[in-house]
Every structure is written in C-alpha cells, then in structure tokens.
A protein has these predicted regions:
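SAM-dependent methyltransferase catalytic region
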Residues: 1-106, 112-116, 125, 129-138
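C-terminal substrate-recognition regions of SAM-dependent nucleic acid methyltransferases
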Residues: 31, 35, 113-340
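Flexible loop/turn segments at secondary-structure boundaries
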Residues: 49, 85-86, 244-246, 353
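A generic structural-conservation signal
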Residues: 77, 342-345
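Short, amphipathic C-terminal "tail helix"
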Residues: 344-355
C-alpha cells in the first residue's frame, strides 16, 4: 500500500470517493455506503508506505478487517499476512480480538507465502479466514507446509499468541504443564547497553564494541544501560532471524537463529544483537549457547518468531535449564516425554547447527 500523498494532488482534487484510506479512517464505515453487504471478500493493502524502508512500514491490513467487521456482513473473508499470530507493529489489540472472536469459523494458513502467491516473499507467511456473523464456536484450522495439509478443530485463544502448527500444540502443552520459568524472563530487551544500531567504535576506550561490521574500542563512561553486565560472560544473538523474510529454506527447514557468540567480560554490543543470557562463568555461558543451538530450543522459538525479528517474547515457551551442565536434544526430548512423532516433527523442521 502507498500513503495517501502518493496518489497525488490531482487524484485528491478529483475527489476519489472510493479511496481505500477513507474507509479505514472513518469511525462509522456504514456512512460511506448506501447498501448493506451480505458478503465481503478482499485482499487488502498489507502495509503503509510511511516514507521509511520496508522494515519500518506500518501494517495496514488489520484496519481493513476491523472496518469490514463493523459493516456486519453475513460472511467476511480476507487474505492477510500471518504475522499477526504473534507479532507485528501495533497488532496486539488486533491479535487479541481475532483470537477471541468465535465467529471465525475457518482459518487457512500457509507457512510459505510462495505456496499461495508464487514468487512473493511475505515475512511469516500468509493466511485467509472466514468470519460468519451467525457462527459461534471453535475454528476449523488448516496449516499448509511443504505440500502437506494439517487440519485441527480448535479454539484460537489457547495462548496469547497463535500456534500455527497443530503438531506443535501437544509439544508446547507438555512443556508448559511443568510451569517452569522460561527464558523470556532473562533475555534482554533491544539495546541491552543502550546503543543503537548505527553506533560505531571510537578511537579509544576500555571496552570492546561488537557491532554489525565487526568490533572496535568503546569508552566505558558512555555506557549508562547494562553496566552490571559488562563484566559478565554474555551469550549474544542477532536481532534478525536466519531466514530471509521469515521464510524456510528450499527444503522447508528453519535455522531460526543466525549470529550467535559469547561476549567475554568488557565486551558489549549494539541493538543489532540481544543477550540471551549471561553468567560469571565462561562454562555456564557456553552451556547456554549450546542450549540455544539445540533443535528443541530453536523449534520453540520458531513457534513465536513468525517474521524476521527475534525478540525476548520469542523465548516465552523456552524453559530455563540448569546450565551448570550442557544439554543435548536427546536429553531434552526425554525430559519432556516427547513421542517419536513429536521428535520427528522437530527434527524435520529445524536445521542442525554445530554445537
């Protein structure tokens, strides 16, 4: 979608009454039409060209969905990005309303947008839904991945976010049933040391700065945030996921995490990176890193990380472990009593990484 200004002064002077953005900016869309709608079908603009790059563009599609619902049609069906399942800028209230709306009778999901729109990469995949005014009940959900369709009748609001893979539901329920503290309680927010992405090293300094082009010196007196972490062994991961636009590789598998390394004491980083843990012990930091590299952990992160961004929220299903020891996938599968089928599902979705 383009901003209204992009349509030009001439178009505005001619009074383009059907301009899409008039529809989403009115409190009562019924006033725009002299008729009632029994059926509304659409593929709305996905984002607003706000003058920045694609990463900063604001989602727009949810506004069309919300306004269309206000028209109270008998049936509403729209094709929209699937990022709303667990992320997206400004989509929290939309996600809550969608997951709690029992009038959504069907939801069809495509992990890869190219299965729906050949040649088109849409971060997090694509979906379409059927909303029925007179319906109230569970949703008939279908996920399409690697040419396979998995169907499940379910309530959409089991969690605060939506789990797209039916096979993952059982795995997550086994893990969450133990009520263990999860890693989202320790993973840093963006800018763990208060440094934006465009910060570069200085000519001199007591610290070593890790930034997107390498490392360099940085003055300690410029660090205000995260000073208590400077002398820790820190586990650093990239804010961007490994997958281009959140899409799987050609084999349909995900690596999930990209750059991962340990920052020793006196090393810091910009907001290009997050800290996934830290310790006074190098060995414990190494064990945290090994845990992050397991397929088990990256699978759980992938259930929330449906786009190209990794945030602390993506670790909400990842249980904390005793990091005085290293963990293997086999030990984790046994600890959480995963079945052979559940293990195969994880193994076939997540690419291996060297430990």
């Amino acid at each position: 979608g383009a901003s209204q200004a992009a349509y030009g002064e001439q178009a505005r002077q001619e009074g383009l009454e059907s301009h899409a953005y008039e529809f989403i900016h009115t409190n009562n869309p019924n006033n725009l039409f002299s008729m009632n709608f029994d059926v509304i079908i659409g593929n709305p603009p996905y984002q607003l060209d706000d003058g920045g790059n694609g990463a900063s563009a604001k989602p727009l599609y949810h506004l069309f969905v919300e306004q269309a619902m206000k028209l109270k049609p008998k049936y509403l069906s729209m094709v929209i990005p699937a990022r709303w399942y667990s992320g997206g800028k400004g989509l929290a209230s939309f996600r809550f309303s969608m997951l709690n709306d029992e009038r959504i009778s069907k939801l069809i999901d495509y992990t890869s947008s190219e299965d729906c729109f050949p040649g088109v990469d849409i971060a997090g995949g694509i979906c379409y839904f059927l909303w029925e005014r007179e319906y109230s009940g569970q949703c008939n959900y279908t996920n399409n991945r690697n040419g396979k369709r998995n169907n499940l009748i379910k309530s959409l609001n089991e969690y605060k976010i939506f789990i797209r893979y039916p096979a993952a539901d059982g795995i997550i329920k086994k893990i969450t049933s133990l009520n263990e503290t999860c890693m989202n309680t320790i993973v840093s927010t963006r800018k763990p040391f208060g440094l934006e992405t465009n910060v570069v090293p200085s000519c001199s300094g007591e610290l070593t700065l890790r930034y997107n082009k390498g490392t360099g010196k940085y003055p300690a007196d410029k660090i205000i945030v995260g000073r208590d972490l400077i002398n820790k062994w820190k586990v650093m991961i990239s804010y961007l996921s490994s997958e281009h636009a959140g899409q799987p590789d050609k084999s349909g598998m995900f690596r999930v995490l990209s750059t991962m390394e340990i920052l020793p004491p006196t090393h810091i980083c910009t907001e290009t990176y997050l800290l996934a843990g830290w310790s006074d012990s190098k060995e414990e930091a190494e064990n945290i890193l090994k845990y992050l590299k397991t397929k088990f952990t990256r699978f759980l992160i992938a259930q929330i990380a449906v786009s190209q961004h990794i945030t602390r929220n993506c670790f909400s299903f990842v249980p904390l472990q005793d990091f005085s020891k290293a963990w293997t996938d086999e030990e984790l599968y046994a600890k959480y009593a995963l079945t052979k089928e559940e293990i195969e599902f994880i193994e076939n979705m997540i690419r291996p990484m060297e430990s």
